[in-house]
Amino acid sequence: VPPGGAKAMIENGVLDGVDHVLGVHVMSTMKTGNVYYRPGYVQTGRAFFKLKVQGKGGHGSSPHMANDAIVAGSYFVTALQTVVSRRLSPFETGVVTIGSFDGKGQFNVIKDVVEIEGDVRGLTDATKATIEKEIKRLSKGLEDMYGVTCTLEYNDDYPALYNDPEFTEYVAKTLKEADLEFGVEICEPVSYTHLTLPTKRI
């Protein structure tokens, strides 16, 4: 449950005097019995948002007397698809997903309000910051373009996971030298979900 307990625990001193923390994440897509690792950024951070688009309702036969929130909201969803493809470097990892678009009403009634919810993932804090900036810019532009009122709630709740490179290599080397039954492999960053990751035997 966002924002999780780690931040509060750290602020209360749970890591005082601690040099390193080792964490384990179980993934069903990985080969059973193996240990996978990666120095640096390895798992994406997350944010989520809710956007309320307030227009003016009306009858379907008289669109000129209304301000269609569904049209404005649909434009936002479409424009959002360009954030990753046109605002991020090809070498950055980011994704924006719209998981909910609530505009249910009657077939002959122009909807006065829609609510949109989305999920944001970024492999670095800088990537997440760029996506957040663009979402806020688009919501503001929506007001200017369609004359609607937008209320945006943006929650940046989980940072990206960063493994200290030197310590990570030390742990991997130690496991390899222990000659245990399981393999030790380096993996690609986990971007947004549990994907089958390409791996390289070391």
Regions found by a protein language model. Give the residues of each.
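Short alpha-helical interface patches
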Residues: 12, 31, 51, 125, ...
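Active-site-proximal loop/turn and secondary-structure-junction residues that shape catalytic pockets
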Residues: 28, 156-158, 199
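Metal-dependent amide/peptide-bond hydrolase catalytic core
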Residues: 71-195
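Histidine/acidic-residue-rich, glycine-tolerant segments that coordinate divalent metal ions
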Residues: 1-111, 192
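Single conserved hydrophobic/aromatic residue that forms the stacking wall/gate
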Residues: 194-202
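Anionic group-transfer/hydrolysis microenvironments
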Residues: 25-27, 121, 198
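Generic "edge-of-domain/loop-turn" microfeature
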Residues: 57-58, 125, 159, 202
